[in-house]
Amino acid sequence: MYNRPRMWDGQRILTSSKKPSITKKSYTLFLKPDKKVSPAKVGQVLSSHFTGTKYSSYGKWKGGYRPINVPTDVESHILHVPKEYAAIQWLTMASPANSVYLPFYTNIIDTSSQYKVDGDYQDPTNTKSAYWTYKTTAMVIEAYKHKKFIDSSTGKKTDLIYKDVNPTKKAVTKQLKANLAQSDKVAKTLSGDKLTAYLTEQNQKNADYAQKKWQTMNNSLIVHSNKLAPVTKSKLTFNK
């Protein structure tokens, strides 16, 4: 039962017209998706924890099935090879459900600084590290994913995902797609060393932009999580 429910979840997202059952003992190996698959759709599959179903590990987790996305994920990536050129690696660090897929051109001369792993970047207190920026989000969400608090701006109950993560993820993804479309246009006018230098520069700009937004969001997460932390009441006793 380790992998079958995860196969069901992937097929549920890509071929919902088939209406598969999570309790099936076998699944068709090859299926044609209902619609053309985009990097975003693949990301939806890789980020899924039975999202939007009664089996969600962020809900009642009926059945206790292991999801595709788990809190201990280290990274997730999608290799995208457009017809016009190759290639783009969509990379997210830590748990993809609470992170964002960044488009990285592969025809480059250097790796974005926050993704270089050496001694300093293995330190969880290092704010320059992309991994620890996104891992911080995953750790806070995992601790409080089942708890709600009153949103002071609306007076309604909400949780950390809907209040902080989802809006940030949506805004950052939209901006990254716009950045990619613009840099694609410029890249078509370049070649050789100028092209690779430009693509390397764009990767760094996107990495810096997304990480800054995520660090700002993490600050908000920590503030809001304080509202969810349990308060322990103790009774004091005194010797007479």
What are these regions (language model features)?
Residues 1-240:
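C-terminus-biased signal that marks the final domain/tail of proteins
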